[in-house]
């Protein structure tokens, strides 16, 4: 029902199967022997391990699932009826080490904004900012068409200001903006809107995207190619 929910058949009727498209996926690991992701469709620029550590089977599950939903093969030996949305697309996978969600909701601290754009008492995000800048530089330099990001930080975007976000992530924003690249050629960044629904019993308002997926709400230069997405149930209702 998922393919029907996104009207995939209309795209297929126009010949849009993912052919000649590369999907970037950043996640904790990928089983590159999985039947859904044929080795011939996995970019040689992929990085399947991190910090000289190879992800274990558990760490590969989520990334393998995401890759299968995005680009799982149409034709395969076991004739399973499942296939990915863009079943002819290539995949460039970058594995990064991800932490387990905290049991308690703990929104990230971006310091204090005095209302005039001046930020104080902010933690040092230089290392994290450099990391994301270098990560997105990989996709941009390789002209990857679209990138899936199923990770992030706790904290509703409406609880932050433009000044706070720019202060914490200047290089990330610059890389995502892709200045000098025509809109039609920019890499599109797709984000899971967030996992705050898991903290509903703690009174968290989860009706807004979290920090990274919601960044385009505050940063004009990444609007149009940074997208927050949600999951829905079979009735079309946004999942909890």
Which sequence ranges carry the predicted segments?
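Short coil-to-helix leader/linker segments, especially the first N-terminal amphipathic alpha-helix
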Residues: 1-9
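Substrate-binding/specificity loop regions of serine endopeptidase catalytic domains
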Residues: 82, 152-240
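Short, solvent-exposed secondary-structure capping/transition elements
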Residues: 4-5, 79, 133
């Amino acid at each position: 029902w998922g393919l029907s929910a996104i009207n995939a058949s209309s795209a297929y009727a126009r010949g849009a199967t993912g052919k000649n498209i590369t999907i970037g996926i950043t996640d904790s690991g990928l089983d590159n022997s999985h039947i859904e992701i044929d080795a011939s469709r996995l970019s040689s620029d992929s990085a399947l391990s991190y910090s000289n550590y190879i992800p274990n089977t558990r760490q590969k599950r989520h990334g393998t699932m995401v890759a299968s939903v995005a680009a799982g093969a149409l034709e395969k030996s076991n004739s399973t009826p499942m296939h990915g949305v863009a079943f002819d697309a290539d995949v460039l996978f970058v594995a990064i080490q991800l932490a387990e969600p905290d049991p308690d909701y703990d929104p990230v601290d971006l310091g204090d904004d005095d209302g005039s754009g001046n930020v104080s008492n902010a933690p040092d995000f230089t290392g994290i900012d450099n990391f994301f800048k270098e990560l997105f530089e990989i996709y941009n330099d390789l002209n990857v068409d679209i990138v899936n990001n199923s990770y992030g930080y706790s904290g509703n975007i409406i609880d932050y200001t433009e000044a706070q976000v720019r202060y914490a992530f200047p290089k990330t924003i610059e890389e995502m903006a892709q200045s000098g690249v025509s809109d039609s050629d920019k890499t599109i960044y797709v984000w899971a809107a967030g996992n705050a629904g898991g903290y509903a019993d703690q009174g968290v308002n989860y009706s807004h995207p979290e920090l990274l997926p919601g960044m385009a709400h505050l940063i004009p230069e990444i609007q149009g190619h940074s997208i927050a997405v949600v999951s829905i149930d079979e009735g079309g209702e946004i999942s909890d």
